[in-house]
């Protein structure tokens, strides 16, 4: 399942995003952020982080550098 979703994101990045243009206000872009989040945390939590990020990406936000959060070590 993870590989399929990551493949769909890559498809979007390679073929759809160039047509729509660069609209993301953040670095890394929302699609790259979601890709990295799914790689790091898995499909469920990574998708959750990606959706939260996409909802924050609008004309009224300043944007800027917003990396995927690091995994916290458990004690």
From Swiss-Prot:
SMART domains: Haemolytic. It is a peripheral membrane protein. Keywords: Cell membrane, Membrane. It comes from the Bacteria. It is found in: Cell membrane. InterPro entries: Membr_insert_effic_factor_YidD (IPR002696). One of its GO terms (cellular component) is plasma membrane. Its main location: membrane. Transmembrane segments: none annotated. PANTHER family: MEMBRANE PROTEIN INSERTION EFFICIENCY FACTOR-RELATED. Belongs to the UPF0161 family. Could be involved in insertion of integral membrane proteins into the membrane. This is Putative membrane protein insertion efficiency factor. It comes from Carboxydothermus hydrogenoformans (strain ATCC BAA-161 / DSM 6008 / Z-2901).
